[in-house]
Amino acid sequence: MSSNSFLTPRIVEVHNISPLHAKVVMEPFEHGFGYTLGNALRRVLLSSIPGCAPTKVSISGVVHEYSTIDGLQEDVVDLILNLKGVVLKLHNNKTQSVLTLKKSSEGIVTAGDIEATHDVEIVNPDHVIAHITSGGKIEAQITVEKGRGYWPSANRSKEDKSSSSIGDILLDASFSPIRRVSYAVESARVEQRTDLDKLIIDIETNGSVDPEEAIRYAAKVLVEQFSFFADLESTPLPTEQPKAPVIDPILLRPVDDLELTVRSANCLKVENIFYIGDLIQRTEAELLRTPNLGRKSLNEIKEVLASRDLSLGMKLENWPPANLENYIKEPGHASS
């Protein structure tokens, strides 16, 4: 079956409404293809265009995100929200960089105050991060990374957690440089044919990517994904027997095996934390909200876990297992 009879669309016009906002006109499409391809492009633009975002911050004098900073109008939560609004670009194929923010003079702290390396470009230097009052100052280390989509801090890998130190705050990262996308389909004409489609994509970015470039990237993603179907052959799928999830035996041990102080152990049990697998999924901030569990107890827990190559904030896909009691009764899994 030949597809040569289909018309080939092209970008015929780009209306640059502002540096961040453009309307891209493409035609001609066969009747109905404007909606089909317009919806596909919109979904890829919103979900799959790569970008950069802050993923971790360490602020001098701050141990967790619920702190306040003397001499700063904003609390740490507001400061983090403002940091997420900084638009960056990483050059020379870099995927990560650590930036420094230092300011001790009274006034407004903007993205332009961040000391960027030659591989990092700050797109919106006038973006307000904080306000310093008399006698205040701010010192922070900001880790920025390249990625795509949305990356919740709770989904970070074990390596990210173990490499973090006290005072490091992991951020929920939204990498997408696309702020808004919509599309409209109008009638188009080629010679005597009047039943064709014209596709108009209205796209707004954060300034780190050109709107037309973003559309070309989205189209390339779709072409690569659909190319598989062009050579599609019928092949039987191998049948696999479902496997029981493998649970690390140490996660099935009771927290009593950690030999914590009585105060720390009692605090954990009040929070229904009975197994090591329960404990490692809690974050520092969650434990600090536990009644009677302070920074000293938290440090004790972290040190004991570190001695077993574990850390707080780890994500377990199959916890708790549906047959937890059976796991514990198996040979080698006994709690004591």
From Swiss-Prot:
Keyword entries, A-Z: DNA-directed RNA polymerase, Nucleotidyltransferase, Transcription, Transferase
Q: What is this protein called?
A: DNA-directed RNA polymerase subunit alpha
Question: Its family?
Answer: Belongs to the RNA polymerase alpha chain family.
Please explain the role this protein plays, according to its UniProt record. Answer: DNA-dependent RNA polymerase catalyzes the transcription of DNA into RNA using the four ribonucleoside triphosphates as substrates.
Q: Which reaction does it catalyse?
A: RNA(n) + a ribonucleoside 5'-triphosphate = RNA(n+1) + diphosphate
Under the heading Gene3D superfamilies, the entry gives: 5' to 3' exonuclease, C-terminal subdomain, DNA-directed RNA polymerase, insert domain, RNA polymerase, RBP11-like subunit
What Gene Ontology biological process does one annotation of this record name? DNA-templated transcription
Q: How does it assemble?
A: Homodimer. The RNAP catalytic core consists of 2 alpha, 1 beta, 1 beta' and 1 omega subunit. When a sigma factor is associated with the core the holoenzyme is formed, which can initiate transcription.
Natural source organism: Nitrosomonas europaea (strain ATCC 19718 / CIP 103999 / KCTC 2705 / NBRC 14298)
